[in-house]
Amino acid sequence: MSSLEQFVQVVIDSPSPYTNLDRIYVHNRILGLVGEDQPVEATDEQVTSLVDALVKTAVQNGKIEDAQSDRSILADQLMDLVTPLPSILNQRFWDKYQVSPKAATDYFFNLSKTNDYIKTRAIAKNVSFPAETDFGELEITINLSKPEKDPKAIAAARNQPQDGYPLCQLCMQNEGYLGRLGYPSRSNHRIIRMTLGGETWGFQYSPYAYFNEHSIFLDQIHRPMVINRQTFTNLLEIVKQLPHYFVGSNADLPIVGGSMLSHEHYQGGRHVFPMMKAPIARTIDLGVAGVEAGIVKWPMSTIRLVGSDVVALTDAAVKIHDAWMNYSDESVDVRAFTDGTRHHTTTPIAYKDGENYVLDVVLRDNQTSAEFPDGIFHPHQDVQHIKKENIGLIEVMGRAILPARLKTELVEVEKYLLGQTNQMAEMHQAWADQLKATNSITAENVTAVVNAAVGNVFARVLADAGVFKWDDAGEAAFARFISAIN
């Protein structure tokens, strides 16, 4: 059986709308996309391998250019054939939800992997390892999954007319969008509709997941990120609807926020992050009945709220957030405003712990200064050889997303430490010399030494981003802020 015939069978056997009666129609649809000549056969019977073969057939038949953008657009068009229509998918999701929330997300997650919306082959390239630090075990990842941008595609995209559709990559307008030069294909993309605060929101998976079942919850309306009472209410409502998931929001300011501030959205999934395991350093009283509160033993300044009453938890979170928005303490460089510009916000995270809800509220400050032009509470210059990008939600919780360059750069650091010929980047020199001076390095332990050191740098990165440091001055300043809340 040819790759084309095998894929036709996959389409008919899939949860798509097609049945055996549609076989000839589906066959001809695919022929129209890939061409009738020069068939390429798949290396195995995996759906992704069949699609790869069909895309190669299309290239050989001149149906598409042999360019990353064209190949991706066609692959997703083919995968769309094995994907239910949005209306059918939503109905099936909520039918399965009646069995259990987990049954519903399992169905949607597995479908999103099968139709290659979640790029499992690319994600498998990522490097990850644990690292023991003073704040417990952190999670280190080197992100290799996102495709490098093709210089030709970038140049061609510059000459494409910008029609502003879709408005951004998070908009619901992306569902089923064909894609174009410089804009990702989304033919096989599906969004579950859900209600939050009386409004329609979307739930989808992230194509290049950073952790298990990495999800995005997005506002139906294209409007900027904001942290307010409704944010806390929405996060707790999502956890109520999907109790096996955590969910959090990036901060709504540059430097301390994520990379997408233009569209209101949250991120969640099925993963227990290091911060969620971190203990309470000391309990505090916020004067909200039914809410236990405490300062978390964590490098970033975090207040944990625990309780079964979501309204009381929301009240407590708003109390913290509103106090922080206007709080300054010159003794520790904390300033809510400079020249009328706001600097304060929070990064909130919600999850279940048994019957209780937990809301972790992380204090953020995005000031810059002459000494720290990238941010006073941002990775400082001496750790930027490992991480210089913004510290967003996922990293706040203890999972490092480090740049792809480190995969090769750290190999060169290891060679340097072993006295071998190397091409180590100059920016790693001081760090590598310090490792050399403080460790007895052998061929057997060099990788473990470097990995542990990367973990300690990431702990320092988080400490740099923390507004109240774990020293006498910082702890006293944190105590003053707690008093100010009340």
UniProtKB/Swiss-Prot annotation:
It is an enzyme of class 2 (transferase). GO terms for biological process: galactose metabolic process. It is found in: Cytoplasm. InterPro entries: GalP_uridyl_Trfase_II (IPR000766), GalP_uridyl_Trfase_II_CS (IPR023425), GalP_Utransf_C (IPR005850), GalP_Utransf_N (IPR005849). Pfam families: GalP_UDP_tr_C (PF02744), GalP_UDP_transf (PF01087). Its EC number is 2.7.7.12. It catalyses: alpha-D-galactose 1-phosphate + UDP-alpha-D-glucose = alpha-D-glucose 1-phosphate + UDP-alpha-D-galactose. One of its GO terms (molecular function) is UDP-glucose:hexose-1-phosphate uridylyltransferase activity. Its main location: cytoplasm. One of its GO terms (cellular component) is cytoplasm. The keyword Cytoplasm applies. Keywords: Carbohydrate metabolism, Cytoplasm, Galactose metabolism, Nucleotidyltransferase, Transferase. Transmembrane segments: none annotated. The keyword Transmembrane does not apply. Pathway: Carbohydrate metabolism; galactose metabolism. Belongs to the galactose-1-phosphate uridylyltransferase type 2 family. This is Galactose-1-phosphate uridylyltransferase.
